[in-house]
Amino acid sequence: MNKVLLTPAKCALDMGDGSERGLYVNQDYILQKMKKVHRGISLMYTYYPNDKEWPTRACQIDTGRESTGAWDSPYENYFPYRGGREGLRDGEPFNFMKDIRRHGMDVVLTLTIDPHLKEEDIILLAKDLRPYGRLLLRVNHECTGDWFCYTKRASYQEIADFFVMVCRVMHKYAPNVKMILCAGMWQKSTGKLEMEDIFLEAHKAADIWSGDNYLSLHWGWPNDHVSKETANYARYSVAEVYEKAKMTLKRLRKITGQDKPMVLSELNADGDVAGPYVQSNMMKQFMDLLQKDKENWLSAFTFYQFRDDGRLGMEITDPNNSEIGIEQPIMNMYKKQLHKAFFSQKIIKAEGGSELPVTLRWGGSEDAEGIEVPVKFNRTPVLFELTFNDKLLPLNMMIEFNGWWFYKAPGTKCIDLMSYFYEKSNAIKKPGIFKLRYFLPPADGMNKPKTGDPYEAKDGDWLYNYYAELPELPEIRIEESPVCRRITHLK
């Protein structure tokens, strides 16, 4: 038995889960589909508390006229963020944030915000986010465009200055939050970033640099169809998009004199444009380029998204029942890529004792302590499960076995791991020792100080780390042949 440490992948993968184009899908379902955790799950919300229509969702506001586009509304058509002034911390997005963290992943939160809000409003948002560990926050993304509603309310300089103010507030009141600036990207025609002078100070203030770039996109959805008679869509060269993203980072390093992580916060191809098979092939080409590139320049990208009302998802929403998804060809391709070493967190031996009981630290999906146990198999088993006694029953646990991940919720007594062997490629070909690892993310999805209100408590280690004790190991039950061989004949 050893103590191990979960560390970053060469390129992390995040998953978009819910936006204006689709509902949130719970993490149990996604884990069952993917058989592996992501680094983070991306949520998208909007916040315009000064508007008279607030908090009505934009698509439900009666404007007295027919909508002409996806963003033809008073504010963006994401679900409303109900924290902040309202202080509703038990509903969206907080219930989903807790679900994400319980399942061993970090929260990646996008907020489009009224750029005329004051510092005191942002302080309220910062306090909302303090209990959620190492959280990534993207504010007013694609800010050099003209489609989002906030760009119609302020100048680009005002938008840039607003982002700098939000960074300053978050760093002071929620230091666990890292700020993502998703702004203009490199342009081949100029050799510069779009609006790089206006957003220079914002780039310097951000913790993480980002861009959004689709390999193909039908931006006319849902108001028109891709056809020879319409023009609201495009398909791009995968190689050119790759170069654009990479050159964006190089240009940012040059103009800021800084070096920060680079991510792509929205990436996919749109099945509406050239069909689902081309969608899958284009994304595979991009992911192959990343793995062949020795510079390892991209820290992470977010696949947008898991289930989509259009054709931007691994699943498309069943039009008869929004709780059901229809799997697309891209899911199988992406799942194979997700399990590759390049996109997987590394699990390495950690310092410190592993004697039981042991206290394990959960910092996040790229920094967490676990316990590793060797398991011997002579052949493919017919039964492989873990059982949890009364001491272990309350624990919230993520379990890793040979690259596959399983979740144990508080109160669950037994976890069946046999599904790993249902994949023909995972059959035991010769006797060997396999590694089983246990990690303990927060049971309620939140970090809390030993005493006091997490929204108001003093800064400390609790902002970044959650600790839980593993008193003993689960019982491992393995059967390599059927227990019952005798046939009982009916009388």
Predicted regions and their residues:
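Substrate-binding cleft of secreted/luminal carbohydrate-active enzymes
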Residues: N2-Q27, K33, Y47-Y48, K260-E355, ...
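Alpha-helical scaffolding within the catalytic cores
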Residues: V25-K33, G84-F96, E120-K127, K188-E201, ...
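Aromatic- and acid-rich polysaccharide-binding/catalytic face
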Residues: I41-K52, E196-A239, Y304-D309
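Glycoside hydrolase catalytic-domain groove-lining segments
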Residues: E66-S67, P74-Y81, Y214-V273
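Aromatic-lined carbohydrate-recognition surfaces of secreted/lumenal glycan-active proteins
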Residues: R168-E194, G257-D272, L298-D308
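Aromatic-rich peripheral "rim/lid" segments of glycoside hydrolase catalytic domains that contact
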Residues: D293-W297, T302-T412, G445-K491
